[in-house]
């Protein structure tokens, strides 16, 4: 839409980009709604060819468009693999029972990684899970070269939508926070650089544990937010405290 092309958008989820933090979700929806008409939470969408155009209807949103871009999730296709013959057990929904740390299906020598888990369908997560699963599998078959090596654990969750501004969530999501967690908010309206960039709608939310004073997670809508999210993920994985973070170099 910023290139002069009229764009309309819809999604089945009522929350844009599945943002868990309500303040960040509200800021993102308000901002991007000014960029293009949107209809969220629409389960039924009509896309019907009419001559050289496509009639598009989603809730109250109706438009005749030239092109339709569809993005959809990935569902693991495990039903035809007969994993039960390898000792894999399943839950009531037909999903394998597996250990999140080792990626091993319970009571079996089958390991899941990447999209097969259906849990973190992100490229960097899939790459890391492939390494973990391979190392655990070699241990399981008794490969002596892997027995004494440190076990690689899962990294802190890091999810980024590469938009302008970026949307990112790091560590614990807002819905996963313990009741005692402290939540602090920084907004673009209070930052000189954001004012110059004319970005008052930018927002950063940080979550911390008051007892350990460690950072638990973050959610943000910021220009260049991917870099800030990456640094915050490092800080959370290192179990940095608020004081340690404040002592680090920073700029405006």
Task: Identify the residue ranges that each predicted region occupies.
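Short acidic-glycine loop/turn motifs at beta-strand connectors
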Residues: 50-51, 85, 92, 210-212
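Flexible, glycine-rich terminal cap/loop adjacent to redox cofactors
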Residues: 162-252
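General small-molecule cofactor/ligand-binding pocket signal
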Residues: 37-41, 111, 182-184
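Rossmann-like dinucleotide-binding cores of NAD(P)H-dependent redox enzymes
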Residues: 1-51, 55, 121-127, 142-175
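Cofactor-binding loop segments of dinucleotide-utilizing enzymes, especially the Rossmann-like FAD-
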Residues: 12, 115, 220
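FAD-site-proximal beta/loop scaffold in flavoenzymes
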Residues: 63, 67-146, 246
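Short loop/edge segments at beta-strand edges and connector loops
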Residues: 40-43, 58, 92, 185
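Glycine/Thr-rich phosphate-binding loops of Rossmann-like dinucleotide-binding domains
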Residues: 17, 77-80, 120, 194, ...
């Amino acid at each position: 839409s910023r290139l002069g092309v009229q764009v309309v958008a819809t999604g089945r989820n009522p929350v844009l980009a599945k943002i868990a933090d309500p303040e960040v979700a509200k800021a993102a929806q308000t901002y991007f709604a000014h960029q293009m008409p949107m209809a969220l939470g629409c389960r039924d969408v009509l896309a019907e060819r009419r001559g050289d155009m496509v009639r598009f209807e989603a809730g109250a949103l109706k438009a005749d468009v030239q092109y339709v871009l569809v993005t959809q999730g990935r569902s693991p296709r495990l039903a035809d693999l007969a994993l039960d013959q390898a000792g894999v057990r399943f839950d009531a929904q037909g999903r394998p029972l597996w250990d999140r740390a080792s990626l091993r299906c319970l009571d079996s020598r089958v390991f899941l990684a990447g999209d097969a888990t259906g849990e973190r369908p992100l490229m960097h997560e899939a790459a890391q899970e492939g390494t973990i699963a391979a190392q655990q599998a070699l241990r399981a078959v008794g490969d002596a070269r892997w027995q004494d090596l440190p076990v690689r654990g899962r990294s802190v969750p890091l999810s980024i939508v590469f938009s302008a501004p970026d949307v990112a969530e790091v560590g614990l999501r807002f819905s996963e926070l313990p009741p005692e967690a402290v939540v602090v908010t920084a907004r673009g309206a209070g930052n000189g650089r954001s004012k110059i960039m004319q970005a008052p709608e930018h927002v950063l939310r940080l979550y911390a544990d008051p007892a350990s004073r460690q950072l638990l997670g973050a959610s943000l809508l910021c220009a260049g937010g991917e870099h800030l999210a990456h640094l915050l993920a490092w800080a959370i994985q290192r179990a940095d405290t608020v004081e340690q973070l404040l002592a680090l170099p920073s700029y405006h």
